[in-house]
């Protein structure tokens, strides 16, 4: 019988002491994504409502956004992160909840920017829903 090869040993995660970073919250109607990067744009931690175990329409709720932001903040704070500049994108209901939970997790919020893309009369929008 052929022997199984042993899996390669993983390197231990090196703790980086990064004082400040950028937290990008992308909140859509269906989900909320939280990505925490250092000042160069390298991802330190990320989370989403779906990755936290929410399924279907519950991913779009403010509570799911709160849990996602908490998870990402805890992971980033293990790397030594203390303060963040928050960039919010999208029209979803989890925007404010995610910002509040970043602050409650112990991160100092230095600035809040809204970077939602707004067209200057670009593409034609989809037709209105008739329910």
Swiss-Prot record:
One of its GO terms (cellular component) is ribosome. It comes from the Bacteria. Belongs to the universal ribosomal protein uS11 family. Located on the platform of the 30S subunit, it bridges several disparate RNA helices of the 16S rRNA. Forms part of the Shine-Dalgarno cleft in the 70S ribosome. It comes from Natranaerobius thermophilus (strain ATCC BAA-1301 / DSM 18059 / JW/NM-WN-LF). It holds the Pfam family Ribosomal_S11. GO terms for biological process: translation. Keywords: Ribonucleoprotein, Ribosomal protein, RNA-binding, rRNA-binding. HAMAP family: Ribosomal_uS11. Part of the 30S ribosomal subunit. Interacts with proteins S7 and S18. Binds to IF-3. This is Small ribosomal subunit protein uS11. GO terms for molecular function: rRNA binding; structural constituent of ribosome. PROSITE patterns: RIBOSOMAL_S11.
């Amino acid at each position: 019988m052929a022997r199984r090869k042993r899996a390669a040993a993983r390197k231990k995660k090196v703790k980086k002491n990064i004082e400040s970073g950028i937290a990008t919250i992308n909140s859509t109607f269906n989900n909320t994504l939280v990505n925490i990067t250092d000042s160069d744009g390298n991802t330190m931690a990320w989370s989403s409502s779906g990755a936290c175990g929410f399924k279907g329409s519950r991913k779009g709720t403010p509570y799911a956004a709160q849990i996602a932001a908490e998870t990402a903040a805890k992971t980033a704070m293990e790397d030594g992160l203390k303060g963040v500049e928050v960039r919010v994108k999208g029209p979803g209901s989890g925007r404010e909840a995610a910002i509040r939970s970043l602050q409650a997790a112990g991160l100092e919020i230095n600035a809040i920017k809204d970077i939602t893309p707004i067209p200057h009369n670009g593409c034609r929008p989809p037709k209105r829903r008739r329910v």
